[in-house]
């Protein structure tokens, strides 16, 4: 705790206003997904401005990787916390998320107003197919990065993928159970007692609290709040990890959107700056207008904020504990398997004729071979044009 307190009392080389303005700009112009966004933060804040030290940045990045939540948003929370505490974390996070939230709300309004028109349907006819290709290549890259050669991890991956395909939803208890299984195999319980380190799981005990939140309520906004609070606690490994979870709840359980509307929501997230999970604002708007968008976005980011700032003071001491990284590794592999399963589930809904199959295939190849030269937003725009062309024939 002393390390964290001393950190907060060091006079920073920047004001909270300057840091907030930086993240407001990044949230408005930061395209490229979570990896690109955290790269921009390192370039701008560590290398160029030197507001944050390399050690502080790496600590924040590590915490963002091991705790549930969207990577870029959590790193922004931590960097706001470093010198300005809880208030700094909240203001910086709000500044980072606000621009993309306003964009998706505007798109939600346009979608609601014009979604029934032929040209809008034609646009999303192509966009939905491209989304499948992009998610497929993302799942492939995540699989190569996270699973490795371990038979245990491959088993977990395949079980979660198959479960998602069969149930058409992500099973949270299976995700958490996967992390627990890897932990038990690598570190049997007698080893914990021997080492006396059961108290090392800083932050992880909070996760079941979010999982246990009931979703039964008579209020629509209450249902939205409870569901997206749960969603915010289970974004492990990548922002795309939330896709199968959201599909299971929004489409299968609550029936708020149909499959095509959900795919359109994912597409909107890919063409806007900021974190991918801001699609929750778009979904919330379609379900319950502007109040729904606000409730969904706030509920989504509250767990991410809490699971960043609460463990932060203790992270210097416990952050490198191998048990934490082992548990998170198992959960991440399970989430990656769920993403792979979601590709199949969503593909059934979107790739229903030759043109959509070709658009999806071209998007996949483009993301794979031309990822840096042809960013995802541009692929989506090209797919939209292709959709208009094919739709009219």
Swiss-Prot record:
Membrane topology label: Multi-pass membrane protein
Induction section of the entry: By sulfur deprivation.
Spans through the membrane: 22-42, 90-110, 119-139, 146-166, 201-221, 231-251, 261-281, 282-302, 327-347, 370-390
Pfam assignment, any one: Chromate_transp
Keywords: Cell membrane, Chromate resistance, Membrane, Plasmid, Stress response, Transmembrane, Transmembrane helix, Transport
Family indicated by similarity: Belongs to the chromate ion transporter (CHR) (TC 2.A.51) family.
Gene symbol of the encoding locus: srpC
UniProt name for this protein: Probable chromate transport protein
Chief subcellular location: membrane
InterPro entries: Chr_Tranpt_l_chain, Chromate_transpt
Domain of life of the source: Bacteria
């Amino acid at each position: 705790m002393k390390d964290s307190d001393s950190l907060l009392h060091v006079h920073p080389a920047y004001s909270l206003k300057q840091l907030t303005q930086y993240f407001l700009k990044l949230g408005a112009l930061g395209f490229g997904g979570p990896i690109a966004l955290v790269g921009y933060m390192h370039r701008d804040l560590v290398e160029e401005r030197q507001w944050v030290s390399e050690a502080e940045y790496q600590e924040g990045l590590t915490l963002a990787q091991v705790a549930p939540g969207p990577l870029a948003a959590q790193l922004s929370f931590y960097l706001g916390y470093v010198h300005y505490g809880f208030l700094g974390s909240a203001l910086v996070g709000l500044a980072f998320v606000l621009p993309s939230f306003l964009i998706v709300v505007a798109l939600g309004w346009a979608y609601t107003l014009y979604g029934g028109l032929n040209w809008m349907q034609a646009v999303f006819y192509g966009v939905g197919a491209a989304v499948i290709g992009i998610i497929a290549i993302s799942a492939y890259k995540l699989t190569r990065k996270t699973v490795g050669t371990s038979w245990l991890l491959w088993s977990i991956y395949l079980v979660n993928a198959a479960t998602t395909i069969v149930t058409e939803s992500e099973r949270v208890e299976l995700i958490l159970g996967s992390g627990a299984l890897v932990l038990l195999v690598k570190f049997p319980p007698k080893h914990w007692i021997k080492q006396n380190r059961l108290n090392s799981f800083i932050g992880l005990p909070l996760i079941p609290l979010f999982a246990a939140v009931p979703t039964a309520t008579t209020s629509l906004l209450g249902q939205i709040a409870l569901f997206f609070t749960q969603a915010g606690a289970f974004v492990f490994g990548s922002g795309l990890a939330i896709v199968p979870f959201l599909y299971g709840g929004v489409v299968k359980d609550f029936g708020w959107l149909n499959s095509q509307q959900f795919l359109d929501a994912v597409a909107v997230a890919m063409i806007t700056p900021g974190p991918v999970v801001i699609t929750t604002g778009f979904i919330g708007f379609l379900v319950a207008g502007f109040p729904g968008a606000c409730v969904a976005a706030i509920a989504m980011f509250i767990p991410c904020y809490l699971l960043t700032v609460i463990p932060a003071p203790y992270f210097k001491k416990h952050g490198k504990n191998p048990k934490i990284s082992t548990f998170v590794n198992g959960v991440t592999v399970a989430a990656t398997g769920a993403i792979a399963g979601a590709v199949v589930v969503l593909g059934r809904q979107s790739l229903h004729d030759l043109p959509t199959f070709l658009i999806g295939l071209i998007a996949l190849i483009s993301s794979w071979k031309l990822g840096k030269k042809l960013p995802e937003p541009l692929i989506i725009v090209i797919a939209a044009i292709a959709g208009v062309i094919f739709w009219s024939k």
